[in-house]
Amino acid sequence: ITTKEIAKICGVSRTTVHRALNNTGRISEKTKRMILETAEKNGYRPDLLATGLAKGKTYYIGVVVMDVNNRYFSQMLSALEIEARERGYFINITLHQNDKEIEKEQLCKLADYHVDGIILSSVNKGEEYKKFIESLNIPVVTIDNKIADKIPFVTVNGRSAISKAVCEIAESGYEKVIFVCPPLAEKNLENIYVHEERTAGFKEAVKKIHGLEYVIIGNWDYQKQAKKELEKSEKKTAFLCTGDMFALNLIRMFEKNGKRAGQDYGIMGYDNIDFLEYVTPRLTTIDNHVEKVAEEAFNLLLQLMENKNVAETERILETVTVQGETI
């Protein structure tokens, strides 16, 4: 039913109906009650988008990420949805599947739908893309992958996290550490800022630890290469992976070859994805505080949408190591 039909049933003007439904303007309690009862009886549902456009605020937030099969992003989306719901917003989720053009298309569509703001994990980067983001004329907060300076940005300190992890591995008696970061293979093709930061942290740390041997695996054939590295290693060896799924894939692969994590080799992941509690042995990993990142990103976006003067638009959170049984 429409407001026009409600007005006809009640014998009043559409203006009076709008006043009753929005609780604004002067209207008698008797008329207001009649209109509200008619609306409820006939299943009236307001056009929130039209109402929002009229008020200049839709209470819709666009969220653009890679995919939902990645446990990190599924946890991120869940956390963002909770943040939005608690503040009276609704999120519109769209995926770019690591495709630069799809990402741009989805951002344009969100702008066309008049969302109030956007939270973006981008596969694009650079000054030209920064200009495109600014041309949307919508507050945008990026998470994890930095696009360019002065674009609002929330992430964790991956460089420091990996650097500390290398020290912890060395202190645990390991003489060789193999850094596993498959996304490095995409360095010249897409935005892999978080993985570049983690790699930088690794390189900085190994240079400071005398006698620690290291290898960097930066391709998608990482399982095969990791197997070769462990087979030829004569030293106590640990793997440091830039994602829990990379670590779990290695554990599964080595188990098929009769080698046990924490006994025949050490291994540490990154992300602290939610289902690690069901994995044995418990993977030692780095908690990147996905819920805190979501909260910070939403709070920052909220401030920008409310046109508040935000002094610091880059938020870097610290991580912690979650001790398991594999280091």
Where are these regions (language model features)?
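N-terminal helix-turn-helix DNA-binding module of bacterial transcription factors
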Residues: 1-59, 72
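Short beta-strand segments enriched in small/hydrophobic residues
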Residues: 16-19, 53-69, 176-188
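Bacterial carbohydrate/catabolite-sensing allosteric modules
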Residues: 41, 82-87, 135-142, 146-327
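Amphipathic helical "hinge" segments at domain boundaries
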Residues: 42-117, 196, 203
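Short beta->alpha connector loops
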Residues: 44, 97-100, 121-126, 220-221, ...
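Short hydrophobic/charged patches on amphipathic alpha-helices used for structural packing
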Residues: 50, 104-107, 130, 166, ...
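Structural motif
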Residues: 64, 119, 238-240
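Active-site-adjacent beta->alpha loops and helix N-cap segments on the catalytic face
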Residues: 125-134
